[in-house]
Amino acid sequence: MKVILLEDIANLGKKNDIVDVSDGYAKNFLIRQKKAVALTSKSQEVLNKDLAILQAQEQQAILDATLLKDELEQKPLHFFLKTNNLQTFGSISNKQIIDEINKDQKLVIKHMITKPHALGIGEHIVEISLHKKVIAKVNVIVSKE
């Protein structure tokens, strides 16, 4: 029996996949637990509409992330650290970089910095994952206060 999965199921498939399973497994477990629906022409149409909506949302998310990437890469972020001769006190963390970006942006970016974890004095390139397919390389300048 062919069914459309309504959620991810280990060793079977992911949400919206069409899989072929035994009749008993489909009727007694998957359909009864509302983890799948039987494949019919109507359920196929609903699946196609849902997939089209998901694809449009994904394309819009990529477009938004690309626009944000272009904006972030144009202007560097400036930070200042206290120093005593050659010794610096502290470093710039991921949270400080995210907070600085969120001041200027309408979007809220959380935990997207891929590297590095702490920055000292100097000029650094920080990669920020805005989407699975879009990574912005932001110039971060850390100066003495």
Swiss-Prot record:
<keyword id="KW-0689">Ribosomal protein</keyword>
<dbReference type="GO" id="GO:1990904">
    <property type="term" value="C:ribonucleoprotein complex"/>
</dbReference>
<dbReference type="GO" id="GO:0005840">
    <property type="term" value="C:ribosome"/>
</dbReference>
<keyword id="KW-0687">Ribonucleoprotein</keyword>
<dbReference type="InterPro" id="IPR009027">
    <property type="entry name" value="Ribosomal_bL9/RNase_H1_N"/>
</dbReference>
<dbReference type="InterPro" id="IPR020594">
    <property type="entry name" value="Ribosomal_bL9_bac/chp"/>
</dbReference>
<dbReference type="Pfam" id="PF01281">
    <property type="entry name" value="Ribosomal_L9_N"/>
</dbReference>
<comment type="similarity">
    <text>Belongs to the bacterial ribosomal protein bL9 family.</text>
</comment>
<dbReference type="InterPro" id="IPR020069">
    <property type="entry name" value="Ribosomal_bL9_C"/>
</dbReference>
<keyword id="KW-0699">rRNA-binding</keyword>
<dbReference type="GO" id="GO:0003735">
    <property type="term" value="F:structural constituent of ribosome"/>
</dbReference>
<comment type="function">
    <text>Binds to the 23S rRNA.</text>
</comment>
<keyword id="KW-0694">RNA-binding</keyword>
<dbReference type="InterPro" id="IPR036935">
    <property type="entry name" value="Ribosomal_bL9_N_sf"/>
</dbReference>
<dbReference type="InterPro" id="IPR036791">
    <property type="entry name" value="Ribosomal_bL9_C_sf"/>
</dbReference>
<dbReference type="Pfam" id="PF03948">
    <property type="entry name" value="Ribosomal_L9_C"/>
</dbReference>
<dbReference type="InterPro" id="IPR000244">
    <property type="entry name" value="Ribosomal_bL9"/>
</dbReference>
<protein>
    <recommendedName>
        <fullName>Large ribosomal subunit protein bL9</fullName>
    </recommendedName>
</protein>
<dbReference type="GO" id="GO:0006412">
    <property type="term" value="P:translation"/>
</dbReference>
<dbReference type="InterPro" id="IPR020070">
    <property type="entry name" value="Ribosomal_bL9_N"/>
</dbReference>
<dbReference type="GO" id="GO:0019843">
    <property type="term" value="F:rRNA binding"/>
</dbReference>
